[in-house]
Amino acid sequence: MWEGSEILSSGEGGNHDRLEGAPLRLVAWESTRACRLSCLHCRAQAQHEPHPDQLRKEEILRVIEEIASFCRPILIITGGDPLLREDIFAVSSYAQERGLRPVMSPSGSLITPEVIERMLSSGIQRISVSLDGSRAEVHDYFRQAKGCFEETLQTLEYARQGRLPFQINTTVTRHNQDDLPGIHDLVVKLGAVAWDVFMFIPTGRGIPEMAVTPEEYERIMTWIYKMSQDSPLMIKMT
């Protein structure tokens, strides 16, 4: 989840007749199903091609206009990989113009310094990138493709150089639970503003056998709590 005082602030946005007293703070838009990767645990079951019924540009602009009529939330642009939409920066620019605060969750496989510049110029305030291992063999196993670990590190370096804040998301399964201390240390080293730890839920492509046991879940929660007391990171658990 996207949180943090540097993005969220209380009292912003107005009320709507139908939602009086309860303005939205977060809106997630699954912009496309398309993605170059085939992650084992992908909730969205992303494919190489976009879904034929995904929202067209004019449709999502109307949705943004409706949202902006009663509040100014963070707009989380997810996928698939949002960067596979040619109109994605036009949409994020429009969202910013209407007072929303766009953030993006790219796959990390299409980032260049030029893309970082376009993100910034179109109003993207932060990106969220997945990192599921502190070593290539762990991270790339989840992605089912060699080289993704190095691509992710390069993406984060481009973001750091471009002064685009980034958070790192990690999905915990039985395959990487013992690597959490190493992932934490790498996240700190990379300069992330936050580390969001997601406990795996068997949905999408994820199968039940990937989940940790209840005992392991409790141990992980205890470890994360203790780690968060001294870590320089904002650590969240979902």
What are these language model-derived features?
Residues W2-S122, R126:
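Conserved alpha-helical substructure of the radical SAM core
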